[in-house]
């Protein structure tokens, strides 16, 4: 499988001139400017040396409009993009001309406030998905961190727990029962007397039966005929 390759450029440098913004017939903006990058080193004799490279930058659409509005000569920026080479024919000589530029897709302004023509730094801009963030003002740096509020201190002493009311020990058999069973009072309640029952009524005696014996002398003989 053949590799498609990578075409990506990252630059951090300063603008050599103000951006030139123009509009194409379809209404899209195009911005052109140059960015200088410098590198320094020491030669064999220990003398410092410096070399500056100039890069041609092109931006399109909304990113080009932002560059024309915020960037000035000397502004320090961060750029991501890709290399592209344009070809055209010279009208005077008829020869082909070539120009290699960096087609920038993302940009970040690195100047702090007050530098680069008084602009505000820290803005991130990109052409992908048409997302653009306005430059943000840097908040003043504080030399200290706010002291966290301490939690309210609790008293150094703990309240003495209240003891449960003591119950008299159970005196049965000379020992205490084990466990957490409630203890009975040391005295036994006086048993209540059972209610007195009335004596059952005596059975009534039957009236004595009288044995009637007729008196033989009382006129019985009058009815007997002889």
From Swiss-Prot:
Compositional bias (Acidic residues): 215-226
Keyword DNA damage: yes
Composition skew (Gly residues), residue ranges: 114-125
InterPro entries documented for this protein: NA-bd_OB-fold, Primosome_PriB/ssb, ssDNA-bd
GO molecular function per UniProt: single-stranded DNA binding
Record carries keyword DNA-binding: yes
Stated role: Plays an important role in DNA replication, recombination and repair. Binds to ssDNA and to an array of partner proteins to recruit them to their sites of action during DNA metabolism.
Motif Important for interaction with partner proteins positions after renumbering to this chain: 221-226
Protein name in UniProt: Single-stranded DNA-binding protein
Renumbered residue ranges of the record's region Disordered: 111-226
GO cellular component labels: nucleoid
Gene3D superfamilies linked to this entry: Nucleic acid-binding proteins (2.40.50.140)
Segments traversing the membrane: none
A Pfam family of this chain: SSB
Subunit structure as annotated in this protein's UniProt entry: Homotetramer.
Keywords per UniProt: DNA damage, DNA recombination, DNA repair, DNA replication, DNA-binding
One GO term of the biological process aspect: DNA recombination
Annotated ranges, domain SSB: 6-111
Biased composition (Low complexity): 126-210
């Amino acid at each position: 499988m053949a590799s498609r390759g990578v075409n990506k450029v990252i630059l951090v440098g300063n603008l050599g001139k103000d951006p030139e913004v123009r509009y194409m017939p379809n209404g899209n903006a195009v911005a052109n400017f140059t960015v200088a990058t410098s590198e320094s080193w020491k030669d064999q004799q220990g003398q410092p040396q410096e070399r500056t490279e100039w890069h041609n930058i092109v931006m399109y659409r909304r990113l080009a409009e932002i560059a024309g509005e915020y960037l000035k000569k000397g502004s320090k920026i961060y750029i991501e993009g890709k290399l592209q080479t344009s070809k055209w024919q010279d009208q005077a000589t008829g020869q082909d001309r070539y120009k290699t530029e960096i087609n920038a897709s993302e940009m970040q302004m690195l100047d702090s406030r007050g530098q680069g023509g008084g602009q505000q730094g820290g803005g991130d801009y990109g052409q992908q998905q048409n997302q653009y963030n306005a430059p943000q003002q840097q908040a003043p740096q504080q030399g200290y961190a706010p002291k966290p509020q301490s939690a309210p201190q609790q008293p150094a002493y703990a309240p003495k727990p209240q003891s449960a009311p003591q119950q008299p020990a159970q005196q049965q058999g000379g020992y205490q029962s084990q466990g957490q069973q409630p203890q009975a009072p040391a005295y036994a309640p006086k048993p209540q007397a059972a209610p007195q029952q009335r004596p059952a009524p005596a059975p009534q005696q039957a009236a004595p039966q009288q044995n009637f014996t007729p008196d033989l002398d009382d006129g019985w003989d009058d009815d007997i005929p002889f």
